[in-house]
Amino acid sequence: MAVIKAVDEYADLMRVSATSAGNDHRLGGNEAPPAIVSIFLGDELTAVLESIENDTFFGKQKKVQLDIGAHVLPHFVKDTTDRNRTSPFAFTGNKFEFRMLGSAASVANPNVVLNTAVAEALSQFYTELEGTKPEDMEQAVHELIKRAIRKHKKVIFNGNGYTDEWVAEAEKRGLY
C-alpha cells in the first residue's frame, strides 16, 4: 500500500524524474507507456485490495486456460499479473516496474524519488500506528490499509492506457 500511496501522492515527481526531450516525445507512443502516471496491479491483486476495502472474503481467482489454437501443445494458464504494456508503473508478480524511463536513461533519479516517496508513506503509516496497543494492532493496521485504499485507489488502472477513454477517466480522477 505504501507504493500505491507514494505513486499517487508523488506522481508529478515520478513523471519529472523520467523527463527528457526524447522521452517526452516517446511517452504515449505505441511502444511506450502513456505520460499519465497510473499503476497496473492485475485482476488478482486488485480483487485482494477490493476485498480488504469492502471487508469481504477473498476467494482465490479461478485459473483461466489460454486457448492458443494448437491442440498438440500443453495447456497454459493465463498469468494473473502484468500483460499490460501500456502501464507506466506495473506490478509484475513480485515487484513493481517503473516503465516511463527511457532505455538509455539512468535509473538514479526515479529510484531516489520512488524510494523517498515510499519511505515517506511508511513513515506516515508508522506515525499513525505509533502508540497502538499490541492487542489492537491488527485491527488498526486493517483500518489504516482500508483508508489508504479508498484514498489512493484512483491511481490504479488495469485497462488500456492508449485509449481516449483512459485520458478522460484520468482527468475525472484528477490524474491528468
Regions found by a protein language model. Name each.
Residues 9-176:
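Acidic, glycine-enriched catalytic cores built around paired aspartates
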Residues 1-8:
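Hydrophobic, small-residue-rich alpha-helical packing segments that form membrane-like cores
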